[in-house]
């Protein structure tokens, strides 16, 4: 598969048949120069509703017809309530549930994080934040989404050997780099990419320092917008 990291928590994954976007916050993301109109996914995975994760999802989904996969309550808001999501289609799954496509599947896990967005003039809870386990080409990628450190991350590794973990390190709104090191140990991932850092003043972190504290060869810091093979 081919993976591109756009900064914050935004990724593109290309399988043999399918293009997947994860949390495509692109407009307003200082790390990327990618134009959302140049991306043509079949699926968009959303860990939660916050704007720095939902990002450009609705515009991309309307233009391409991509299916949005997210937690079931947020999916219902997208399909039935949110005016900015008009013309989009979301498939909802809940914790423990799996969505399967031709050449990948995604299973939903809990994350310790809040989840709300503006609906009209009100800030409304729209489901709950999640982590996601993607199985692609017999490899498992675990995306923590936004989360605090919590011990149930150990259960992911108990059920699935994790080939690649995407772990938030920025602090303030999520766990910081020190807690992320513990999360990486809980997940026992063969490789780790740090995420959710240095996009805003409140989430400053040093990804190189984080990677240097992982076991040798585990940490990966991709260049923003540059595709790599995994």
From Swiss-Prot:
Keyword Hydrolase on entry: yes
Keyword annotations from UniProtKB, A to Z: Hydrolase
Alphabetical list of HAMAP family matching this protein: UPF0173
PANTHER family per the UniProt record, alphabetical: UPF0173 METAL-DEPENDENT HYDROLASE MJ1163, UPF0173 METAL-DEPENDENT HYDROLASE MJ1163-RELATED
GO molecular function terms listed in the Swiss-Prot or TrEMBL record: hydrolase activity
CDD domains: metallo-hydrolase-like_MBL-fold
Any Pfam family hit: Lactamase_B_2
Family of the protein in this entry: Belongs to the UPF0173 family.
Protein name: UPF0173 metal-dependent hydrolase OEOE_1287
Keyword Plastid set for record: no
